[in-house]
Amino acid sequence: MQPVAPPRKAYGSTGRYVGPEYDHGPLPDVAGRVLELCGTQDGCRYLQRVVETGTAEDVLLVFRSVIADLPALMCDSLANYICQKLFEHCGERQHLAAIQTLARDVVEVARNVHGTRALQKLIDTLTTAAEMGAMRDVLLPHVFLLVQDGNGNHVVQRVMHDFPQEYNQFVYDILTNDALVEKISMHRHGCCVMQRALDHACEAQKTLMVAKVVEHSFPLVRDAYGNYVVQYVLEMPLPGIATRFTRTLRGRFIELAKQKFSSNVVEKIMNKGEKDALDAILDEIIACRDMAVLLQDPYANYVVQTALVTANDAQHRQLVALIVPHLALLRNTVYGKRIMAKLYREPAPGTAALAPGSTAPQPSPLAAGARHSAPPEGAHSGPSAHGTPHGNPRGSPVVERRRIYHPRQ
């Protein structure tokens, strides 16, 4: 037997909620029970309908009934919906009253799973200078705390998205503070805020943010979350951005190549294709006295592979000359075989494939065919053997084009 569908609820022409469970009558008849109705599913729906289709007096009556308990209602699993509906249909005076009421409890509301949605809705509805200025003043002392919270960070993001520069600058002042930029960028949720801030920034805000990320890049590239911020900046269409990072990181690329997260950034800089940046890294690799260590390192070997792919012919010959003496170390490792596959490069007419004086075997089927066939099982094509999250032996995905890191919440 097919189940019988429950009767649909409806609203009468007078604004009365009509249904088998509730028949509340006209709004004035239940004016003293608004808070009670906010706590029930049917009552909450009734009030939302009243606010949506009722008169301005109806909206004002509901608002006055809930304003004193607004923080608690915004955090309620049911009542937050009537709060959001009120924010959509209220005017400036009610918005200012709501902001004033929230002032003492804004952190608790922003960090609550229901409260954050209601607060974001309130921010969405603020359009006047007085409203945005009031919200700025309430949130200003708490930005650093909120950007590190799984729910609160979305409130900060909404301010950056919705408010013009004059009223969202206070967020950028915190994000670019020299004492805070590393702490925020190296936080699970803070790194997301930094990336979204770059998306929503005006030109002046973006310029300062990029400068701060470059300035603090050495600790950031070594961090599990901070490296994503650096990679995000590297993906931005900014002329010479890779070269700016190399000026800060110069002399440290061998150290960074051997670390889990920073090695991703080193490859990202090399793949950016800026000659000065690439030359700076290749010079350090070629000058390294411990090539055998790099070749066998679980992270640096990928940097060496990228170096072989991105180097010009002269640099490639120098790298080959340094690697050939260590071929015996490479034959029994997966990444060693990948390095060997990149040793051979089709020479340009009139040039040699290897550095003068070096000897290497003729390209084996593995070496010669690797560039023209599918990669070994578990490997990946492209300039970085670990450029995608799948099968990455380092467990640290490289941020691809404009990818935003979204940690699990």
Regions found by a protein language model. Give the residues of each.
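Eukaryotic gene-expression regulator signature that favors modular helical reader/repeat domains
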Residues: M1-Q409
